[in-house]
Amino acid sequence: MSRKEELYDITIIGGGPTGLFAAFYGGMRQAKVKIIESMPQLGGQLAALYPEKYIYDVAGFPKVKAQDLVNDLKRQAEQFNPTIALEQSVQNVTKETDDTFTIKTDKETHYSKAIIITAGAGAFQPRRLEVEGAKQYEGKNLQYFVNDLNAYAGKNVLISGGGDSAVDWALMLEPVAKNVTLIHRRDKFRAHEHSVELLQKSSVNILTPFAISELSGDGEKIHHVTIQEVKGDAVETLDVDEVIVNFGFVSSLGPIKGWGLEIEKNSIVVNTKMETNIPGIYAAGDICTYPGKVKLIATGFGEAPTAVNNAKAFIDPTARVFPGHSTSLF
């Protein structure tokens, strides 16, 4: 295949909600679109971190399960058959003399007339449990993500953490698991006030201020967890079937920092057209920043069409930035 045949109109780096909607909108603008995603699946953090959790602040949905939203976004984008490249991490972007871009991943090289970066918070990794022997149980019955609530049915579950995810998982697992214990190293939870209120009214066993001090198991599964009172002498040993740790996540822009883009506080600076400082490269969603920026899925859904429409005009100066409403296009 020649480079000309491989040349896409718009390449979207990041296959989360904003990237998926950008792919749909790019297709609607009759652009040849490709998505490059570093994860094994599309959906970004919604699919990777909390597919079973409900989202309440997407317009038109009183509530929607994260994975269901991802599935709908995929179906919407698939109407225009975008090319999908999964498990590829973009390492470098080069602007060529003909104003097109060469995009090198850890697996292959891609070519595009314009780029939209929708990489969310960048690459993210969970903050891990720093207790002796923890690593050997990761992916067995020590988890940092909950992908399937039913996997915890009838089990004794210990959750460690004090933020939104830890509290939300405790509440969601309460009716599924045999029992749920939530420990936090501080007396006060950092989660949303309403969630904490629901937690206090639930049957979840709350132990504060405690932290995990020891794991006991057979190398395949943890059977007992010892917890130590923080700044105290109390010690308890709990029987467990599953352990979920949520201490938050560490995100990084990684190679993006080396692409020559203007970066501010780990975000890509854009103007009202979603243009970066490099003509032909746009950014949308949580990865970008501008005065008054609010990082919400709903915001990304508005920024994606802005980025696509301006990318279309960049590729084809005769194209209208605003194409009209979808009701007149289908």
Swiss-Prot record:
What is the recorded name of this protein? Ferredoxin--NADP reductase
Matching InterPro entries: FAD/NAD-bd_sf (IPR036188), FAD/NAD-binding_dom (IPR023753), Fd--NADP_Rdtase_type_2 (IPR022890), Ferredoxin-NADP_redctase_2 (IPR050097)
Q: Name the Gene Ontology molecular function terms of this record.
A: ferredoxin-NADP+ reductase activity; flavin adenine dinucleotide binding; NADP binding
* Database matches in Pfam families: Pyr_redox_2
Taxonomic lineage is: Bacteria, Bacillati, Bacillota, Bacilli, Bacillales
| Quaternary structure and interacting proteins, as annotated | Homodimer.
Catalytic activity reads: 2 reduced [2Fe-2S]-[ferredoxin] + NADP(+) + H(+) = 2 oxidized [2Fe-2S]-[ferredoxin] + NADPH
Q: Which cofactor does it need?
A: FAD
Q: Name the source organism.
A: Halalkalibacterium halodurans (strain ATCC BAA-125 / DSM 18197 / FERM 7344 / JCM 9153 / C-125) (Bacillus halodurans)
Is the keyword Disulfide bond in the record? no
Cofactor binding summary note: Binds 1 FAD per subunit.
State the family it belongs to: Belongs to the ferredoxin--NADP reductase type 2 family.
Q: Which domain of life is it from?
A: Bacteria
Q: Which residues bind FAD?
A: T18, E37, Q45, Y50, V90, F124, D286, T327
Q: Which UniProt keywords apply?
A: FAD, Flavoprotein, NADP, Oxidoreductase
- Under Enzyme Commission nomenclature, its number is 1.18.1.2
Task: Give the transmembrane region(s).
Answer: none
